[in-house]
Amino acid sequence: MKHIPSNVFIGIDVSKDRLDVAVAPSGESMGFTNSEDGIVLLADFIKPRDPALVLFEATGGWEMNAVRHLAAQRLPLVVLNPRQVRDFAKATG
């Protein structure tokens, strides 16, 4: 059976201590600690939503443990350059 693509997109704002998650189009949001346990909970939150894409803004390496864990879960990931994100936001108003 062919997989039907999801229309769910998940953005993750990363800091040293936190992973703040926003889900589109549902508008859900959730926060997790940026720790081994928090990353496991993050994956448990994301997987049932079957996202088309999970997006991280590169944050000086603080995102890498979460990226590695979610990649091992075979989730579709993109790590974005913060400058490109900022330039895109400016361009779209």
What are the roles of these predicted feature ranges?
Residues M1-G93:
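Phosphate- and other anionic-substrate recognition elements at nucleic-acid/protein interfaces
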